[in-house]
Amino acid sequence: MRLLFFLLITLLFAACSSTPKVHQPKHSSKTEKDLGIGLSPTPPPNERIPGEKSRAMLMEMEGREIPVRIPDANASKIDKNVSNPISIMSSSGGLLTLWALKPRNWVWGYTPIDSFEFGRAKFWRIISFSNGQVIIKNMQEGTCLQAYGNGVIHDICDSKNQAQLWNLNFFDNQAIQIQSVSAKTCLQTPTVRTTTYYSIYLTKCATSSNLDQQWYITPVALEPEPIFFIK
C-alpha cells in the first residue's frame, strides 16, 4: 500500500506541466441512439456504493504473502495487436471501473483501495489497429468502452462502431489523452472528488497543460505480474 501511495504522488507531480499532442479530426458524427440513461453519468440506482468492503478485504490481507503466479506456457496466445491486462488511471488516482456490469451502463473511476472488491471489472486490454486507433476492452465483462452523451459507457464490442474507437494522444510526460473518434472529445475526470467514485466525462480536448485529461496505462492495480523471471 505504501508503494501504491508513492506511485500516485509521483504521477501527480509528473503530470503538472504536460501538453498533449491532440489528434486533429477531419469530420465528426453526432448521431447516437438514446439508451434511456440520460446524457451525463448518473450512479446506478440499484447498486451499492463500494468502498468499505474493499478496505476491509485489504485489511484482512495485511501481512499475508502474495504468491507469485508463473505464466502458463500452455495458455492461449494473445494476438500481437492486443495488450496484456492493464489498469487505466487518472492523474488523481481513479481507475476506470465498471460499477453496474450490465452493458450500456456508465463507466466510473475508483481508487485502487476502494475498487478492490470489483475484481477484474477494473482491468482492461487495449486492441490496436493499423491506423493508430484503439478499442478498450474490459477484462471481466468483455464489453468495450464507448462514447455516449457527456460520458462513457460499456457495451458489446463492435470494431465498426465509431463510438468505441479511440485515439491515444501522448503528453510530454508520456501520460495519454483518450480521444473519442466519433465525438472528437476527450475523457476527463475531476482532480478532486467529493464522493467515493469519480464521474467520467467527455469534454473538449485540452491543447494546453492540464491534469484532468491525463491518464496512465499501468500494470493491473494490486495484482501486478512480475516483469521477468530468474530460473
From Swiss-Prot:
Residues 20-51 are annotated as: Disordered. CDD domains: beta-trefoil_Ricin_CdtA (cd23414). The keyword Magnesium does not apply. GO terms for molecular function: carbohydrate binding; toxin activity. CDTs are cytotoxins which induce cell distension, growth arrest in G2/M phase, nucleus swelling, and chromatin fragmentation in HeLa cells. A lipid is attached at C16 (S-diacylglycerol cysteine). Pfam families: CDtoxinA. A lipid is attached at C16 (N-palmitoyl cysteine). It is a lipid-anchor. The gene is cdtA. InterPro entries: CDtoxinA, CDtoxinA/C, Ricin_B-like_lectins. The keyword DNA damage does not apply. Residues 99-110 are annotated as: Mediates binding to target cells. Heterotrimer of 3 subunits, CdtA, CdtB and CdtC. Residues 1-15 form the signal peptide. Residues 130-217 form the Ricin B-type lectin domain. This is Cytolethal distending toxin subunit A. Its main location: membrane. GO terms for cellular component: cell outer membrane. Keywords: Cell outer membrane, Lectin, Lipoprotein, Membrane, Palmitate, Signal, Toxin, Virulence. It is found in: Cell outer membrane.
